[in-house]
């Protein structure tokens, strides 16, 4: 609450101009977004959001961090798409067409989150868990995940795989990779194999564009062509891999999705 007040004061924003406070959390919420049911990375269960926001004197909205990033990425993408339209009528026809604009967002962070947006709407599922791609099994009886299960996508492609588990930072890992350190090359090849396996699974299931964001993504951009080639090899039908891309939003822009 004090941090919120400090930010508002520092930027000379009047209280009446504050629309609200958005809070992003890496966890699963209930259907009303009033309780954080489970956050594996934070080790929290059934935490009432009201406890988090009670001292903040503004309207608050808490949401899953990956969904917030996905929202921001979607609107950022649409903003530039709309710049190519000739007039308002073109935009209205596009919005009213009902044509699918399916987009899956995968966030590579300390954990691995996901979100699915179709026809400008975030798909939430029956239990508000749609998009928990990080807990899709890619190696049965494999590595232990923070959720307590084994073989999860997250256990193989989170930032920890390339940093904490290698006793280095992401910067140091990719520096060693550029220096052709054999150990780091082996880890990275395994990482890309697991990453493309998961992305291919998502594409097979949902047949929509897949966007990868989060702290790890910027380090992977130089390998985009290699990743697409691997995706082409793994896909059962015809594709050139162009359905895959990296997020365009910066971390600061992504915050607007909350």
Features from the language model and the residues they span:
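Short glycine-rich anion-binding loops that position phosphate/pyrophosphate groups of nucleotides
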Residues: 26-29, 109-111, 216-217
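Conserved residues at the C-terminal ends of beta-strands
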Residues: 24, 139, 213
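Charged, glycine-enriched surface loops/patches
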Residues: 231-245
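Short, basic and Ser/Thr-rich N-terminal targeting/leader segments
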Residues: 17-19, 108-110, 240
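Adenine-nucleotide phosphate-binding core of ATP-dependent small-molecule kinases
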Residues: 1-15, 155, 163-222, 242-254
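Glycine/GP-enriched mid-protein hinge/lid loop-to-helix segment characteristic of carbohydrate kinases
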Residues: 1, 54, 61-63, 72, ...
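Glycine-rich phosphate-binding loop and adjoining helix at the ATP-binding site
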Residues: 1-11, 17-21, 27-104, 221-234
């Amino acid at each position: 609450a004090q941090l919120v007040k400090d930010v508002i004061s520092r930027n000379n924003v009047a209280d009446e101009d504050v629309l609200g406070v958005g809070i992003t959390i890496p966890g699963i919420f209930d259907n009303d977004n009033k309780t954080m049911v489970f956050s594996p990375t934070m080790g929290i269960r059934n935490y009432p959001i009201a406890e988090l926001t009670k001292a903040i004197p503004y309207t608050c909205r808490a949401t899953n961090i990956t969904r917030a990033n996905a929202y921001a990425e979607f609107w950022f993408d649409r903003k530039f798409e709309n710049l190519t339209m000739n007039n308002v009528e073109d935009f209205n026809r596009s919005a009213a067409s009902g044509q699918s604009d399916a987009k899956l967002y995968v966030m590579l962070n300390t954990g691995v989150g996901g979100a699915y947006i179709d026809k400008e709407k975030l798909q939430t599922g029956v239990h508000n868990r749609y998009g928990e791609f990080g807990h899709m099994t890619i190696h049965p009886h494999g590595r232990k995940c923070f959720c307590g299960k084994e073989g999860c996508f997250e256990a193989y492609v989170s930032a920890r795989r390339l940093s904490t588990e290698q006793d280095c930072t992401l910067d140091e890992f990719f520096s060693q990779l550029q220096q052709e350190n054999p150990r780091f090359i082996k880890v990275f090849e395994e990482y890309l194999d697991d990453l493309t396996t998961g992305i291919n699974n998502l594409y097979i299931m949902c047949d929509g564009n897949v966007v990868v964001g989060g702290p790890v993504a910027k380090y992977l951009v130089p390998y985009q062509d290699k990743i697409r080639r691997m995706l082409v090899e793994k896909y059962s039908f015809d594709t050139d891999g162009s359905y895959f891309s990296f997020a365009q939003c910066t971390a600061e822009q992504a915050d607007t999705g909350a």
